[in-house]
A protein has these predicted regions:
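Core structural elements
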Residues: 124-128, 163-177
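Conserved small/polar residues in nucleotide/adenosyl-binding loops
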Residues: 187-192
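Amphipathic alpha-helical coiled-coil segments
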Residues: 152, 156-163, 167
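Flexible helix-coil linker/loop segments in the cytosolic histidine kinase module
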Residues: 180-184
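A glycine-rich (often HGG/GG-containing) alpha/beta subdomain
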Residues: 1-146, 150, 154
Length: 192
């Protein structure tokens, strides 16, 4: 994907923590423009993948919020792209200011479901797993959550793969029976 997207990933209501997610080829450039470590010396673009860093988000010289920033380099991310998650204070205004600063520095607002769409397009999940993400979010009871999590872990894909293997076996068996004039035992076919 050519664009870098961002969105608030938590509910837009007052809470202890709010999460802003950035994903795309310029995610590291965006965060490097707005993040400063506590000592001001750490260059966020140079840190290892899958690490968390304490610091501040600035809009120019204006301090916006105290944050934790998680850096995740492609391809081992949800979307398969470079990804940054900013954990800021969960006030509605604080989250919006951090998001606005991210957008002002090179990201575009994500459409609903766009992170999952990118994960699908980048081969990080199949269609049934992409659908399961929304099912997990909307689960209202234990059964719904468990079922959705099974689907997210690939249970539908595994079932389809098993059926496909059986079909291939049966087709090969039938084709060999058609090629060979000797009688074929269909009890062997039923056993599979």
């Amino acid at each position: 994907m050519e664009t870098t997207i961002a969105a608030i990933s938590t509910a837009m209501s007052a809470s202890g923590i709010g999460i802003i997610r950035i994903s795309g080829e310029n995610a590291m450039d965006v965060i490097s423009r707005i993040y400063r470590s506590k000592g001001g010396k750490k260059k966020i673009k140079e840190v290892p993948t899958h690490t968390i860093h304490y610091g501040y988000i600035y809009d120019g010289e204006e301090l916006i919020d105290e944050v934790l920033v998680m850096i995740m380099h492609a391809p081992r991310t949800f979307t398969g792209e470079d990804t940054v998650e900013i954990d800021c204070h969960g006030g509605v205004y604080a989250m919006q200011r951090v998001l606005d600063t991210v957008l002002k520095n090179g990201a575009e607002i994500a459409e609903p479901g766009e992170f999952t769409k990118r994960a699908f397009l980048n081969g990080r999940m199949d269609l049934s797993q992409a659908e399961a993400v929304m099912d997990v979010i909307q689960a209202k009871n234990e059964y719904a959550l468990r079922s959705s999590m099974d689907q997210l872990r690939g249970s539908v894909q595994k079932a389809i793969r098993d059926i496909r293997e059986k079909l291939i076996y049966h087709i090969a068996y039938i084709e060999s029976a058609l090629d060979d004039p000797e009688p074929v035992s269909y009890t062997h076919l039923r056993a599979h």
